[in-house]
Regions:
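A residue-level detector for a conserved hydrophobic packing site
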Residues: 101-102
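Conserved micro-motifs of the catalytic ATP-binding
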Residues: 50-55, 93-96
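Flexible, glycine-/charge-rich segments associated with ATP-binding catalytic modules
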Residues: 161-218
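Short beta-strand/loop element within the Bergerat-fold HATPase_c
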Residues: 120-130
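Short helix-loop "hinge" at the ATP-lid/N-box region of the Bergerat-fold HATPase_c
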Residues: 111-113
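A conserved beta-strand-to-alpha-helix junction within the catalytic ATP-binding
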Residues: 56-71
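Glycine-rich/acidic phosphate-handling loop/turn and adjacent ATP-lid/helix
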Residues: 132-150
Length: 218
């Protein structure tokens, strides 16, 4: 069984995705055993799907992806008092799959949010030898409060799928989760190339939208 796109894994699970957003930003969710069990069940299904998943490696701007996700989480969690801070200076490009990496990072951030003992989660992009990676630092332990550890197994499998690595460094007060991916010598499209692509899309879609919906992009 081959899945060409990671989105195939989530076919028919839109309702669960909405619940997961509530799970991510509602600490009281940890007391809802029924929903927690469902979350673990879906993770087990995804772990099985990952064994058969195939995809074409792509060049991923890891620093931009990490920053965007961290900022979004910080905004969404602002009312809870938990802050997500991104630290990263230079761009780093890796070979992998942006959707898989996004899912893995969200899993780590949700662990840090739900089980962290401090109201601060620090996320940074790092460089180690021939790899670039993401480091998530929070107070407390990612594993001591977990009933199954499926989430971390999910992250580990994603890293292995992209020829990367995943490991955890723990002290008495903090947990550091690190995902590493092989560096890419390729560069993503430049800002000028992206602007040209967006302009082309706009020029082609705008007349269609006016004709079909009576609306126009601005």
């Amino acid at each position: 069984m081959n899945y060409k796109h990671f989105s195939d894994i989530y076919t028919g699970e839109k309702e669960f995705q909405r619940e997961k957003m509530q799970f991510f930003f509602d600490k009281s969710f940890r007391d809802k055993d029924e929903n927690l069990l469902r979350n673990q069940y879906v993770l087990l299904r995804q772990l099985g799907f990952l064994d058969d998943l195939t995809f074409e490696p792509e060049c991923v701007d890891l620093s931009s992806l990490t920053e965007n996700i961290t900022v979004a989480c910080d905004i969404l969690s602002s009312e809870s008092g938990v802050s997500f801070i991104y630290c990263g200076d230079s761009p780093c490009y890796v070979m992998g799959n942006s959707r898989l990496i996004t899912k893995a990072l969200l899993n780590l951030l949700s662990n840090a949010y739900l089980y962290g003992k401090e109201n601060l989660v620090t996320v940074k992009t790092i460089e180690k030898g021939t790899c670039c990676g993401i480091e998530v630092l929070s107070g407390g332990s990612f594993s001591e409060n977990h009933k199954t550890g499926n989430g971390l197994s999910f992250v580990r499998k994603i890293c292995n799928k992209t020829n990367g690595n995943f490991f955890i460094e723990q002290t008495l007060s903090h947990t550091k989760a690190i995902m590493l991916f092989p560096k890419s010598d390729l560069k993503q499209n430049s800002a000028r190339e992206i602007a040209d692509i967006l302009s082309l899309v706009y020029n082609r879609l705008s007349p269609v939208c006016v004709e079909m919906f009576g609306m126009q992009y601005h």
